[in-house]
């Protein structure tokens, strides 16, 4: 399957799990979805299936965390066999836990190793192997530092697509959350990168809050990755196909999306899933609408109760004024 990076939803730890992705996919057929970051160690040695997903989630990219080329190649091969549409290497996450495993943003300082990792994966898979990174780390935040990284990883590793989180990462002193908010955004640097590496596919990530903003970035770049906004106000995804991909399909109402989740939820509950693990991703669906607070509160107070099922969502939906027709 060919897919476009024109719009994607960022890999977000503890957020973009398979329930979240199924929900997002009901709103947009075209948006590229990413898994949460999965470490090579979890896939190779962990108990449980870390590569499971729903067929409906395509186009779907697996984000890997690791720095051992052999392990990454092994995981990439498994992922391709399971049907993933893209393999993405995390060179952007700044958390201590990640650095201790020698992957994430600290790898920006080792571009040759990143190139080796990408090359090892490309050797064993046919799907695209991409890199998500930052504009710099700590005091290594010159434009030359970024261009050296991209040059080496693209020329020696064969990477043709980069998603640039337009902030640098502080590897010590800031939490991952602070690293998403405190370092200033520098979109022009990503635009410049695209001009200087016009043969590469370059997407941007960081601080994008609307499709209008995405359209502005798309005048300069190949793709836009939306993170927290797509999670906290997911309904923005409902008009992506029409606004960015030229679809003529009608935009779904919020209530339709809720009702389309019912069969999935019933099937998951029958397999022993816990309702709250699914509905937590839906809390922001009515963001900024009358009744939104009551919707959120009803789900939050009831989804965790033993034996709770669809009636929780049905009752929550009844809190949204009918005359809104949403």
Swiss-Prot record:
How is this protein named in the record? Answer: tRNA-dihydrouridine(20/20a) synthase
Bilayer-crossing regions: none
What does this chain do?
Answer: Catalyzes the synthesis of 5,6-dihydrouridine (D), a modified base found in the D-loop of most tRNAs, via the reduction of the C5-C6 double bond in target uridines. Specifically modifies U20 and U20a in tRNAs.
Organism classification, top ranks?
Answer: Bacteria, Pseudomonadati, Pseudomonadota, Gammaproteobacteria, Vibrionales
* Annotated PANTHER family: FMN-LINKED OXIDOREDUCTASES SUPERFAMILY PROTEIN (PTHR42907:SF1)
Q: Which Pfam families does the UniProt record give?
A: Dus (PF01207)
- The active site of this protein is located at 93
Assigned EC number: 1.3.1.-, 1.3.1.91
| Record gene name | dusA
> Which key words tag this protein in UniProt?
Flavoprotein, FMN, NADP, Oxidoreductase, RNA-binding, tRNA processing, tRNA-binding
Which NCBIfam families did the record assign?
PRK11815.1 (NF008774), yjbN (TIGR00742)
**Positions that bind FMN:** 11-13, 63, 132, 165, 205-207, 227-228
The organism is Vibrio parahaemolyticus serotype O3:K6 (strain RIMD 2210633)
Under the heading HAMAP family, the entry gives: DusA_subfam
| Family the UniProt entry places it in | Belongs to the Dus family. DusA subfamily.
Q: Which reaction does it catalyse?
A: 5,6-dihydrouridine(20) in tRNA + NADP(+) = uridine(20) in tRNA + NADPH + H(+); 5,6-dihydrouridine(20) in tRNA + NAD(+) = uridine(20) in tRNA + NADH + H(+); 5,6-dihydrouridine(20a) in tRNA + NADP(+) = uridine(20a) in tRNA + NADPH + H(+); 5,6-dihydrouridine(20a) in tRNA + NAD(+) = uridine(20a) in tRNA + NADH + H(+)
Name any cofactors this protein relies on: FMN
For the site labelled Interacts with tRNA, the residues are 90, 177, 180, 293, 296
Citing just one GO molecular function, the answer is: FMN binding
């Amino acid at each position: 399957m060919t897919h476009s990076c024109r719009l994607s939803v960022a890999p977000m730890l503890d957020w973009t799990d398979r329930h979240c992705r199924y929900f997002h996919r009901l709103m947009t057929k075209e948006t590229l979805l990413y898994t949460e970051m999965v470490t090579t160690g979890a896939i190779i040695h962990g108990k449980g299936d870390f590569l499971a997903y729903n067929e409906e989630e395509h186009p779907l990219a697996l984000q890997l965390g690791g720095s051992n080329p052999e392990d990454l190649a092994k995981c990439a091969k498994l992922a391709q066999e399971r049907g993933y549409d893209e393999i993405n290497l995390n060179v952007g996450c700044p958390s201590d836990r990640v650095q201790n495993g020698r992957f994430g943003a600290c790898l920006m300082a080792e571009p040759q190793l990143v190139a080796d990792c990408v090359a090892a994966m490309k050797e064993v898979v046919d799907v695209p192997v991409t890199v998500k990174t930052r504009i710099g780390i700590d005091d290594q935040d010159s434009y030359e530092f970024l261009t050296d990284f991209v040059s080496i990883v693209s020329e020696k590793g064969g990477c043709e697509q980069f998603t640039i989180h337009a902030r640098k990462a502080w590897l010590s002193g800031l939490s991952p959350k602070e690293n998403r908010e405190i370092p200033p955004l520098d979109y022009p640097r990503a635009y410049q990168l695209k001009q200087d590496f016009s043969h590469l596919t370059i997407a941007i990530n960081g601080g994008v809050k609307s499709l209008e903003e995405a359209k502005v970035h798309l005048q300069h770049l190949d793709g836009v990755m939306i993170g927290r906004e797509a999670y906290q106000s997911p309904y923005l995804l409902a008009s992506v196909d029409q606004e960015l991909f030229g679809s003529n399909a009608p935009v779904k109402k919020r209530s339709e999306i809720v009702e389309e989740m019912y069969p999935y939820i019933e099937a998951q509950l029958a397999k022993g899933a816990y309702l709250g693990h699914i509905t937590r991703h839906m809390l922001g669906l009515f963001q900024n609408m009358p009744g939104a607070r009551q919707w959120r509160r009803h789900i939050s107070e009831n989804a965790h109760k033993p034996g709770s099922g669809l009636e929780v969502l049905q009752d929550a939906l009844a809190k949204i004024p009918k005359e809104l027709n949403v």
